[in-house]
């Protein structure tokens, strides 16, 4: 009689682990990955402390910290290859890998050490790309489609991809293809009233898709329906935690530093994922993003920079603001020394929906504060994405990059897996 083990009791497995993390402002970095099996139940309580590197001056602005946990099924990455792989079982062709470069830190954005083989599983890299493309780039930006990590620039491979600034008038413009006008061909002697209404309807549905429905699930929700994350191979956001990292100023205590002070930021946090049932094999990604509010030294309120104001500019007339097309302005309209050739589009009246931060000119010549010193340049995408080098001058040292965190991931997974003893005692 054979005593081959053909199953296992569902038991809790403690997958708790530590993380000693370092990252850059505005870049999305993976801080933990857990492979999961169909039928698992995954739960996590992460407890840690986040620190900014020592500041050169007193603490001026709190930073905002976002921590996310996503579930990415392997089928979303490998497609039909995964289905065939599972059907073929032990006779299946091994799953593909992707290539990294030879540096130890060129897979750090995925939360792993780069192996000696310079190859990592495809689902790690493609899973990260899927998360970034669906949740962290502006919808009008092109998807990141690199096939291998060795195609990335060094900053992306080490620190993660650049993310958008927190929203304001110049960091969250309308899509660049936004129409400022639309022509309708008519007869020279008459206007087709019904055709005019049809043109309005076409414009309305086009604008809805341009601004609010660039993804399939958004389109379906506009009809009153609902799609699962599986419909468009979208990673499932399981949990998000948001906090503001604050700190304190430290006064000098010895003779050489007496009277001097510098900022220190240490913020404890907790990120809890309630028990989540895993429907099929995949990976649980936990990622972190630290950002300063976009505070620019030369930013000006739009009405103050415009000069002679028209009725439309200043009246706040709801009839006009509700019916006028978007307005195209330039960086010069919201920044001193801004480039008038760098255009972007905003909704009419947007200057009444937003107030810029003000930085006294006394700060302008001082380094050490988390301010954007010069008007952002480059194309629209370059201006919207955070440049972490803008903040290098804030820190005394960046040996542990611009922020670091020490965290305990308390992870419990309930899964059907033989015990270690059962695996040792083969048959």
From Swiss-Prot:
GO biological process: symbiont entry into host cell
GO cellular component: T=1 icosahedral viral capsid
Alphabetical list of InterPro entries matching this protein: Capsid/spike_ssDNA_virus, Microviridae_protein_F, Microviridae_protein_F_sf
Keywords attached to this entry: Capsid protein, T=1 icosahedral capsid protein, Viral genome ejection through host cell envelope, Viral penetration into host cytoplasm, Virion, Virus entry into host cell
Pfam families reported for this sequence: Phage_F
GO MF annotation, one: structural molecule activity
Places the protein is found: Virion
Subunit structure: Pentamerizes and interacts with H protein, G and B pentamers to form 12S pre-assembly complex. By binding with protein D, induces joining of twelve 12S complex to form the procapsid. The procapsid has an external scaffold made of 240 copies of protein D, 60 copies of the internally located B protein, and contains 60 copies of each of the viral structural proteins F and G. Upon genome packaging, interacts with protein J. The mature virion is composed of 60 copies each of the F, G, and J proteins, and 12 copies of the H protein.
Function: Assembles to form an icosahedral capsid with a T=1 symmetry, about 30 nm in diameter, and consisting of 60 capsid proteins F. Upon virus binding to host cell, one of the spikes dissociates from the capsid and the virus interacts with LPS through the exposed EF loops on the F proteins. After the genome had been ejected, the channel formed by the F proteins at the unique fivefold axis remains open.
Family membership: Belongs to the microviridae F protein family.
Protein name: Capsid protein F
Gene (name only): F
């Amino acid at each position: 009689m054979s005593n081959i083990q053909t199953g296992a009791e569902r038991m809790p497995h403690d997958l708790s682990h530590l993380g000693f993390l370092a990252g850059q402002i505005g870049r999305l970095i993976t801080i933990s990955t857990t492979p999961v099996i169909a039928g698992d139940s995954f739960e996590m309580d992460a407890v840690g402390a986040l620190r900014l590197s020592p500041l050169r001056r007193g603490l001026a602005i709190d930073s905002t910290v976002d921590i996310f946990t996503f579930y990415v099924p392997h089928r979303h990455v490998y497609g039909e290859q995964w289905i065939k792989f599972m059907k073929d079982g032990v006779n299946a062709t091994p799953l593909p890998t992707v290539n990294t470069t030879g540096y130890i830190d060129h897979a750090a954005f995925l939360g792993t050490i780069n192996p000696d083989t310079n190859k990592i599983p495809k689902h790690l890299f493609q899973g990260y790309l899927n998360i970034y493309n669906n949740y962290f780039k502006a919808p009008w930006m092109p998807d990141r489609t690199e096939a291998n990590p060795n195609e990335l620039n060094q900053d992306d491979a080490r620190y993660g991809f650049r993310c958008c600034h927190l929203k304001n008038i110049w960091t969250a413009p309308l899509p660049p293809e936004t129409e400022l006008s639309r022509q309708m061909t008519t007869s020279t002697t008459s206007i087709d009233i019904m055709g005019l209404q049809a043109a309005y309807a076409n414009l309305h549905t086009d604008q809805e898709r341009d601004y609010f429905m660039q993804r399939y699930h958004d389109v379906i929700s506009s009809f009153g329906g609902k799609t699962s994350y599986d419909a468009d191979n979208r990673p499932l956001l399981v949990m998000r935690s948001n906090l503001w990292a604050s700190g304190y100023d430290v006064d000098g205590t010895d003779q050489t530093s007496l009277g001097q002070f510098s900022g220190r930021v240490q913020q404890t946090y907790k990120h809890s994922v309630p028990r989540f049932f895993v429907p099929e094999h995949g990976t649980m990604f936990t990622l972190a993003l630290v950002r300063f509010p976009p505070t620019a030294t030369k930013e000006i309120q739009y009405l103050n920079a415009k000069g002679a104001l028209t009725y439309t500019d200043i009246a706040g007339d709801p009839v006009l603001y509700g019916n006028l097309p978007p307005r195209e302005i330039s960086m010069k309209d919201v920044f001193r020394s801004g480039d008038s050739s760098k255009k972007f589009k905003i909704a009419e009246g947007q200057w009444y929906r937003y107030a810029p931060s003000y930085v006294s000119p006394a700060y302008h010549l001082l380094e050490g504060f988390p301010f954007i010193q010069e008007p952002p340049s480059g194309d629209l995408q370059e201006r919207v994405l955070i440049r972490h080098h803008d903040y290098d001058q804030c820190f005394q040292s960046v040996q542990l990059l611009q922020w670091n965190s020490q965290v305990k991931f308390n992870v419990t997974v309930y899964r059907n897996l033989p015990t270690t003893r059962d695996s040792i005692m083969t048959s």
